[in-house]
Amino acid sequence: MIDTVDTPTTRHTVASTALGDLTLVLDGDALTGIYFPGHWTRPERAEVGRQTDLADDPLATEVRDQLVAYLAGERTTCDLPLRLDGPALHQAVWTRLQQIPYGETTTYGALAEELGAAPQAVGQAVGANPVSVVVPCHRVIGADGSLTGYAGGLERKRTLLALEEPAATDRGALF
């Protein structure tokens, strides 16, 4: 959940991308959320602040531009100011997700082992990632290589991994 309710600088806008219209939630000078239509952890309307015009918000425009470039294969990362609120384990998982290189995947079990946490707890933290794509939770797959869980839907996860697959050619398939 986003802990910026009733903050006057909390705002949201919608950005059109190759993955569909994304709701971008910003607070002050930081990105706090990216939500797909039908996203299973989408915050309540009151939690995303006032609506802002994308063209009038430099940070929102920068987020959109970096996401569009990433989805076009022109970037391998997004370099954006983030403010991610959550429990300590979630913070640790989200930090580790940012270290998974473009074109590579890991498993929930491997993350759990690295972090000394239960796989189910790690899975919950991955699923609670408020900034999908920027914090690349789509790079986490099942132990058997299957695509499991993605708040934006498995088809979007498949699309993101397929986008990154050419970078993995020398290392083998992503999934």
Q: Where are each of the predicted segments found?
A:
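Basic nucleic-acid-binding alpha-helical/helix-turn surface characteristic of O6-alkylguanine DNA
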Residues: 1-117, 165-175
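A short acidic, helix-capping loop that chelates divalent metal ions and anchors anionic groups
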Residues: 45, 143-144
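Residue-level recognition of specific faces of alpha-helices
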Residues: 96-99, 133, 159
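The short coil/loop that forms the "turn" connecting the two helices of the helix-turn-helix
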Residues: 116-117, 128, 142
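Major-groove DNA-recognition helix of helix-turn-helix-type DNA-binding domains
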Residues: 125-126, 130-134
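Short Lys/Arg-enriched helix C-cap and helix-to-coil transition segments
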Residues: 134-141
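…primarily DNA-binding HTH/wHTH and HhH modules…
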Residues: 145-175
